[in-house]
Amino acid sequence: MTVPQPPEPIPGARLLFSLDPSVSHLNHGSFGAVPIAVQRAQQRLRDEMEANPLRFFTQGLVDRIAHARRHLAAFLGADPDGTALVGNVTAGAAVVLQSLALRPGDEVLTTDHGYGAVALSIARECARTGAVSRTLPVPLTATDEELVEIVRTGLRPGRTRLLIVDQLTSPTARLFPTAALVAVAREQGVPVLVDAAHAPGMLPATVASIGADFWVGNLHKWAYAPRGTAALVVTPQWREKIQPLVVSWEQDSGFPTRVEWQATLDYTGWLAAPVGLFTLRSLGVDRVRAHNAALAAYGQRVVGDALGVAPERLPKPGGPAVSMRLVPLPPGVATTLDAARELRARIADRLSAEVSVAGWNGRGYLRLCGQVYNTPDEYDRLAVRLPTLLAQR
């Protein structure tokens, strides 16, 4: 079996991070990794805050947040006046859901590739308002055309108040044809929220090119920002309807400031986020994207080969730029949340490798990521040792 050639490592890239060198960190997609330069920038801001907290919070902080927001919005291809910084995609989705004023009979439509925490937020809002949540099953092997048709026929104009779709799915590492899905929903008058948790830094598509009513993406994954940094982008017709989860002193300032200002929080991560973009650009954005996608594809093939998965049975990512890939586990392995957590912990403890393990629709999957600090030999070692560990279950 021919395995694709791995990409050439980016010289010195691993030294930019403070990761434990005794561990193979193959799950960048879950919590990211903050470059040392970004950590230091944030610490300088924290030192400033602690030297004079009153001055830090009361003299110019709102303007400094807006300045950082403009940098991040420009990188995303988004309107800075329509962009609010939030803690993460889950928080941004909650902001949108609670701002819709759902009523009994309304529905929120999603697919079964959605992120679990967002699904929990939908369930809570529906329970509070009397609306209902409906999930469309989408086969892992569905083509883009089939996916669009599934959503088209699933929409119920007049009842569907919101369609939530992923730009790149978390549990299945599948790139969705987001712009086409948004267009289909718009034809039927249904607003769309795009969960773009993994898009910033990984995918080249701009927010404007997608055209969704609401778009929310994490910058603390593939754009090297401190954790707790995400952007919620809202089209003009919705901005005055969007309300913060916590009302505070900037409530009368309108969107986006009233969403951003959540009382006394540590805002230094947002202020340091542009340093993450500088780090990414210094490495070369296109170079990093190509490297990470090629490395993830290599890891998928070598680990899949070790587990006896034929190349044609490896899940397709839906696009060339995807830096996360799935490997099916043997039948019966990690099919439940508890079993997946247990296997992930065993792999971490016994193989010194951090990976994502998830059960989806009755099948367990390993999700592997590629990042500039990874090297091909890390996937090779996992491929050699994983079959023995699985045989010991």
Regions found by a protein language model. Name each.
Residues N52-A91, N292, A306:
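Conserved N-terminal alpha-helix of the aminotransferase class I/II PLP-enzyme fold
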Residues V132-R134, A142-G201:
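Active-site phosphate-binding strand-loop segment of PLP-dependent enzymes
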Residues D81-G82, L97-S121, V132, A339:
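Conserved PLP-anchoring active-site segment centered on the Schiff-base-forming lysine
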Residues D20-S22, S30-V62:
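Glycine-rich phosphate-binding segment of PLP-dependent enzymes
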